[in-house]
A protein has these predicted regions:
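Charged, low-complexity intrinsically disordered terminal segments
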Residues: 7-117, 121-419
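Sec-dependent N-terminal signal peptides
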Residues: 1-7
Length: 419
């Protein structure tokens, strides 16, 4: 079996449910939190000060109030936007919040090493992971641009692996307690804010519903061989997700389909893909166009490789937008499905901590391919000359964005390994 080597710690799971719709992804998180009995553990790269984050925090607080013993959250220190007053109120309520890699004179390398994970685990039995951060734009609620993203709901034994990863990270030196000091008045205002958020939802005025009792495993076929991949907490210990991903790709015999919003292929992966092409394996990669991307600098990194990828024989497709693509997924040989936080770039390979959920199941792999195909319907193909099948090199892109991408090329020699 293809994953016999790559998935050494494979576990049986009951459910592997793809969450494409942003409202489903939000509702599933709400239901998991409200149904928790013993613990809620969450890891997030980004948490903004908006309705999504405040709703999540209000639900975490209420879970603690109703007696859930362990309610803990880790957020990357660089992308923590939760107000201090709210953090103080949560602390007083028994919700523990810590940050990953705060600024440290003793650890200067922490500045570029970030926790890019997005996971919420409940009772060590169920979890959601994928591309969505805690912010409105990832759940279809932003006033301007919303991301096109994907998560997966998993129920079963691999949740224990995810929970153990959380516990290891929580007790490591990489995570620090928050020191927040606010007045009683500010803390009371934060309490009122979270109360108001939940009251509006209880009145049916929100983007999600409370107390639905939804069983997200309902009518889902049982699957086997689910593995929760994660980078080691300490870089010197264990195998990185990049290594495990390369093992799975190395085992491909017919096809490799990858969807990555940021595509700056590390040299080892690029060489591996070119090797698989020579073996007759079909390789397709879906990524953002200059029009849809939210990151001009990584897009400049991709444009450097675009012609080489197409000329090598890779079927490169660029998502037209206008919304940015943010889903991180892959399907190998039409039977192995991968969904997680991992981008095809040097940062995910070497610097960030990442997670990925993998299952070998033809029906689910086809479901994921169908999801990717929906994005392909709004994508153009890149030809051997490094351009879409159009006269214009960068269709429907503003002049200002073209200029920014052109200028970004001059930074690539300095920052490419950190994209």
């Amino acid at each position: 079996m293809m994953l016999a080597v790559a998935l050494t710690g494979a576990a049986r799971a009951d459910v592997f449910r793809i969450l494409d719709d942003p409202r489903d992804a939000a509702q599933a998180r709400v239901d998991l939190i409200q149904q928790a009995d013993s613990e809620i553990h969450a890891l997030y790269f980004l948490a903004r000060n908006d309705r999504i984050t405040l709703t999540a925090l209000a639900l975490l607080r209420d879970a603690r109030r109703r007696g859930v013993p362990s309610v803990r959250l880790i957020v990357d220190a660089n992308f923590m936007r939760i107000p201090k007053a709210v953090l103080a109120h949560l602390r007083d309520e028994g919700v523990e919040v810590r940050v990953y890699h705060p600024v440290s004179v003793r650890h200067p390398s922490w500045l570029v090493r970030r926790m890019h994970e997005k996971v919420v685990i409940v009772d060590g039995e169920r979890y959601i992971t994928g591309g969505r951060n805690l912010a409105e734009a990832y759940f279809g609620m932003a006033r301007r641009k919303n991301y096109v993203d994907r998560d997966v709901y998993v129920e079963g034994a691999s949740a224990g692996d995810a929970d153990q990863h959380f516990e290891t990270l929580w007790s490591s030196e990489h995570v620090s307690r928050l020191k927040v000091h606010v007045s009683k008045r500010e803390s009371a205002s934060a309490e009122e804010l979270l109360d108001r958020v939940l009251f509006e939802l209880s009145c049916g005025n929100g983007f999600v519903k409370l107390d639905t009792g939804t069983d997200w495993s309902h009518e889902q076929r049982a699957v086997a061989e689910v593995d929760f991949l994660h980078d080691p907490v300490d870089a010197a210990e264990g195998e990185r997700v990049a290594y495990r991903l390369a093992e799975i790709i190395e085992g491909a015999t017919t096809s490799i389909v990858i969807e990555s919003p940021y595509l700056v292929p590390p040299k080892p992966l690029l060489a591996l893909l070119e090797k698989k092409l020579k073996e007759g394996v079909y390789v397709q990669i879906v990524t953002n166009s200059l029009r849809s991307t939210d990151g001009v600098l990584p897009q400049a990194g991709y444009l450097k490789y675009r012609r080489r990828l197409a000329r090598a024989g890779i079927d490169v497709r660029e998502y037209k937008g206008p919304a940015p693509l943010h889903a991180k997924s892959a399907v190998v040989d039409g039977r192995v499905a991968l969904i997680g936080s991992y981008n095809i770039d040097p940062r995910s390979q070497n610097l960030n901590t990442e997670v990925m959920c993998v299952v070998e199941d033809e029906a689910l792999a086809q479901e994921l391919l169908d999801s990717i195909d929906l994005h392909l319907q709004n994508a153009w193909r890149i030809h051997g000359n490094g351009r879409p099948a159009r006269v214009e090199r960068y269709p429907n892109v503003s002049h200002a964005k073209k200029v920014r991408a052109w200028l970004a090329r001059f930074l690539l020699p300095i920052v490419e390994n950190q994209l």
